[in-house]
Swiss-Prot record:
It comes from Streptococcus pyogenes serotype M28 (strain MGAS6180). This is Protein NrdI. The gene is nrdI. NCBIfam families: nrdI. Gene3D superfamilies: 3.40.50.360. Belongs to the NrdI family. It comes from the Bacteria.
Length: 162
């Protein structure tokens, strides 16, 4: 896979935007307003989570991201998802990632809290580089890229094919 970019959504708080800037990778932002975005290249999706916490997962995936992914062309180019969240919200921490991963049948590659740490930046850069330059079979590629959740209140997650 030669061409790969980051596609991300960030609200007006710009937390996800600041994280993506630290990556130093080619990126396109999903607009906050209703302007459409269509991509024609493979991408990793980075998305924040908006959920109330506890067992309330309603609204976890931002509406702008749903609109973006409702475009079949955009869906077909997604190669994986990375999500952010706030551990104060317990079980809904970074929940947008697993939701999108399951719906699109793409791997959940990483989850990070708020603005992310220097370690999160390095992990995402490494995931991006490995996916961009990987030439082995697709399933092996997916299995090698999947990482465990690092937050202590979560059990390790593995992507499973159905």
């Amino acid at each position: 896979m030669a061409e790969l970019i980051i596609v991300y959504f960030s609200s007006k708080s710009n937390n996800t935007h600041r994280f993506v800037q630290k990556l130093g990778l080619p990126a396109q932002r999903i607009p906050v307003d209703n302007r459409p975005l269509e991509v024609s290249t493979h991408y990793l999706l980075i998305v924040p989570t908006y959920a109330a916490g506890g067992s309330d997962a309603k609204g976890a995936v931002p509406k702008q991201v749903i609109r973006f992914l409702n475009n079949p062309n955009n869906r077909k180019h997604c190669k994986g998802v990375i999500s952010s969240g706030n551990t104060n919200f317990g079980d809904t921490f970074a929940l947008a990632g697993p939701i999108i991963s399951q719906k699109l049948q793409v791997p959940l590659l990483h989850q990070f809290e708020l603005l992310g740490t220097a370690t999160d930046v390095k992990k995402v850069q490494a995931i991006f580089a490995r996916l961009k330059h990987h030439t082995h079979d697709k399933q092996k590629q997916i299995n090698n890229l999947i990482t465990e959740r690092t937050h202590p209140c979560h059990k390790p997650m593995r992507h499973t094919s159905h």
